[in-house]
Amino acid sequence: MRKLINSYRFGAIEIGGKRYTTDVVIFPDRVLDGWWRKEGHRLCVEDLSKVLNADPRPEVLVVGTGYSGLVKLSGEVEEALKDRGIRLITQPTKEACQTFNRILESGQRVVAALHLTC
């Protein structure tokens, strides 16, 4: 079942009718809550291991960089995604939620990794 994002505000998100208050990774069929990054506001390859090893592989990864956009990506993340043919979109989380829903509804395999605060 596809998991559309119903709403987002600083520190909270509703996905498929369920509310989450920790950072999340959203696959089309499931939500991984409690997503923790090794370096807080810096996204590293190991933070995305479940995305990079997903089967089927996503076509697009949407990264929500936080309410104010403070999360930054390491160059290794961009390279790892490119090597796997995964298109990367980074946006502040509010815009990333809208982008995820739009891409999901278009039928593409999309995953979102969303930081809910900062």
Question: Where would I find each of the regions flagged by the language model?
Answer:
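Non-catalytic interface/targeting segments
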Residues: 1-46, 105-118
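Short active-site-adjacent helix-start/loop capping segments
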Residues: 34, 69-73, 99
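Short, charged beta->alpha transition segments
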Residues: 44-53, 99-100
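Alpha-helix C-cap/termination motif
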Residues: 54-55, 106
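Mid-chain, well-packed structural core segment of small domains
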Residues: 55-91
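Short acidic loop-to-helix transition motifs that present clustered carboxylates
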Residues: 93-98
